[in-house]
Design a protein with these regions (language model features):
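Helix-to-loop junction immediately C-terminal to a conserved catalytic motif
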Residues: 47
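Q-loop/switch helix immediately C-terminal to the Walker
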Residues: 77-95
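Conserved ABC ATPase "signature" region
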Residues: 93-109
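Walker B catalytic motif
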Residues: 112, 141-142
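Conserved ABC ATPase signature
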Residues: 112-120
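Hydrophobic anchor residue at the start of the ABC signature
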Residues: 126
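ABC-family nucleotide-binding domains
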Residues: 140, 147
Length: 190
C-alpha cells in the first residue's frame, strides 16, 4: 500500500499539488485530471524522485517499482528483446519474445530499439514495465502516440500481465480504463 497524506508540492512558487491525499492498495488505479494538473508530479513523489514541500508519503520499505515514464527511456542501441530481458533476470527469452509479440511485430525482436517508430517505442516501454519484476507498476500516459487499435491491445496487455500487483496509470483519456479505481487530482488551491 502507498499512501499520500496532505502532500503539497510547488515549482517556482506555483503550487501544483495542495494537500493531496490518496491511498493506493493492490489492484489498478487511474490517476485522473487534465494535462498539467500534477499527475506526473504525483508519480515522481511516489517514486521518491521529488520530495514534497509538505505532507507525508508512506510506502513499504523495499518496494520495487517498474515505471514507464512519459518519455520513452529505452536502451536505444540494444535490441527490442534485450530491452525486456535486461529488466528481469528471471524471464526466459522465449517468454519475453512471446510477450513482446503481443504488441509488436515479431520481426522487431532483433531490431535496435532506436530504430522503432514512436508508437512502437511506446508499446515496448509498456511491455518492459509490465514484465519487470516489481511490486508496483507505474505507467505515466502510456497510450501517447498510439492509435485506437494499439491502445486497445495495450490496455488488454496491461491487464493480462498485472499479476496481482499495484498499478497506477496516469491518463487524460479514460477510454477502456473504467474498471480502474479513479483518483482525482483537483487544481491546487481548489
Amino acid at each position: 500500500m502507498i499512501e499520500l497524506k496532505n502532500v503539497s508540492r510547488s515549482f517556482d512558487g506555483k503550487k501544483v499539488l495542495d494537500s493531496f491525499s490518496a491511498v493506493f492498495d493492490k489492484g489498478g488505479y487511474l490517476l485522473k485530471g487534465p494535462s498539467g494538473i500534477g499527475k506526473t508530479t504525483c508519480i515522481m513523489l511516489i517514486l521518491g524522485l521529488l520530495k514534497p514541500d509538505a505532507g507525508e508519503i508512506i510506502k513499504p520499505e523495499g518496494i520495487r517499482f517498474a515505471v514507464c515514464f512519459q518519455e520513452n527511456r529505452l536502451f536505444e542501441k540494444e535490441t527490442v528483446l534485450t530491452n525486456v530481458t535486461a529488466v528481469n533476470e528471471n524471464i526466459l527469452e522465449a517468454d519475453a519474445a512471446s510477450a513482446i509479440t503481443e504488441l509488436l511485430p515479431s520481426d522487431t525482436l532483433n531490431k535496435k530499439a532506436g530504430a522503432l517508430s514512436g508508437g512502437m517505442k511506446r508499446r515496448l516501454a509498456v511491455v518492459r514495465a509490465m514484465l519487470h519484476d516489481s511490486d508496483c507498476v507505474i505507467l505515466d500516459e502510456p497510450f501517447t502516440g498510439l492509435n485506437d487499435e494499439a491502445r486497445t491491445k495495450t490496455i488488454a496487455f496491461i491487464k493480462e500481465h498485472l499479476n496481482g500487483r499495484l498499478l497506477i496509470i496516469t491518463s487524460h483519456d479514460e477510454r477502456g480504463l473504467n474498471d480502474l479505481r479513479a483518483v482525482h487530482i483537483d487544481p491546487a488551491g481548489d
